[in-house]
Amino acid sequence: MVLMQDKGSSQQWPGLGGEGGGTGPLSMLRAALLLISLPWGAQGTASTSLSTAGGHTVPPTGGRYLSIGDGSVMEFEFPEDSEGIIVISSQYPGQANRTAPGPMLRVTSLDTEVLTIKNVSAITWGGGGGFVVSIHSGLAGLAPLHIQLVDAHEAPPTLIEERRDFCIKVSPAEDTPATLSADLAHFSENPILYLLLPLIFVNKCSFGCKVELEVLKGLMQSPQPMLLGLLGQFLVMPLYAFLMAKVFMLPKALALGLIITCSSPGGGGSYLFSLLLGGDVTLAISMTFLSTVAATGFLPLSSAIYSRLLSIHETLHVPISKILGTLLFIAIPIAVGVLIKSKLPKFSQLLLQVVKPFSFVLLLGGLFLAYRMGVFILAGIRLPIVLVGITVPLVGLLVGYCLATCLKLPVAQRRTVSIEVGVQNSLLALAMLQLSLRRLQADYASQAPFIVALSGTSEMLALVIGHFIYSSLFPVP
């Protein structure tokens, strides 16, 4: 028998799922609760009514001592992200013996992403007995159970019976419009975001004033730096993410989130870092724009290839509207800045004076927002994805710099290529995951872009501070 308790339910099950299998009044209370619950126990996939065995002292036909319900159903449905119990009846002789210790039951979920076993406790009722298994469902999927009935009082312990034919099917919960709108409000109604938007626009206009049209024409004639950026962003980084997912044995959802993050184009903050670290700003803006355009083709291609290698079959939706919005958010203020530079040179000089302070304020504000927004998604995060996420920006910086060094590019361009490969547009990855996966899976997979974004911003901020300190101590003559 399978009993369910959804999150937020007011129904309580005292005495079930506790540690140990006591006797006396407590076991009688457990038995009474189980008998009361029989008429509305959960159903299996065949919609068969389940009942608790009466506790025979001889094994049934086929030599099976353990059963769930009447033994006719092997697969049981359960909603995702819920608590509940499984009642396993035991017809092993001596199971209901109240004077001598009975056998022990070991239950293992063979897919812990889908189902986790919290504890197992023995119970007795009437002339029979069994076990209550407390479970917690996670992501939607199918979790086979490995059940072992062991006589732990023998030396060595004796395996009485082993079963692998039961499984729990965790069904996805539907996303309600109210929940979705609440989530959107959580991310979009932050007052700090609205305070930063005017600064972002002015800052991008200032970057437009930094664009050198002659340098831009030269890049069109010799696009090697921009091609290096595409190579690092869409070939090397996704491959690195796939290898790390295999090395650290990341769950499929996390692995997919990491690969999509590493397949994303350069982030809008990359040319901000190029400015603060002495890179080529014109090249940085050009590379960010080009990689964002290329992402409309490379992002779905990379995601499809690695999803197949990971045996993930969800249909992935590329957020074209987000990509177009990113392109416009780059192109319009940059174009305004170029126009200001040509028509209003004095105002252009004023913007150039404030671009670095504005950039630093935006960097701190963006880092603060990222930490605030990631609190809920990053709850319960595990060490492997943290370690991998920390290495992604560092490896990207190293790959980009090595590629640029191989072509003997100027130092400023080497820094820019390095930054473009090392700084991903994690918001695009986040949008793609939220559009493609169900809510619980999407939030789980979204840990990867959040960790990469937080790590990248923190590491780049450390580089900027280190660069300022070094420049102050050892100024270039």
From Swiss-Prot:
Coiled coil: none
Region (Disordered): 1-21
Annotated GO biological process: bile acid and bile salt transport; response to retinoic acid
An example molecular function term from Gene Ontology annotations: bile acid:sodium symporter activity
InterPro entries for this protein: BilAc:Na_symport/Acr3, Bilac:Na_transpt, Na+/solute_symporter_sf
Principal place of residence: membrane
Record flagged with keyword Transcription: no
Alphabetical list of Pfam families matching this protein: NTCP5_P3_N (PF24690), SBF (PF01758)
Membrane association type: Multi-pass membrane protein
GO CC annotation: membrane
Superkingdom of source: Eukaryota
Compartments (UniProt record): Membrane
Membrane-crossing residue ranges in chain numbering: 225-245, 253-273, 281-301, 320-340, 361-381, 383-403, 417-437, 450-470
Keywords: Membrane, Symport, Transmembrane, Transmembrane helix, Transport
Family recorded in the similarity comment: Belongs to the bile acid:sodium symporter (BASS) (TC 2.A.28) family.
Function: The ubiquitous expression and the conservation of the sequence in distant animal species suggest that the gene codes for a protein with housekeeping functions.
Protein name: P3 protein
Source species: Homo sapiens
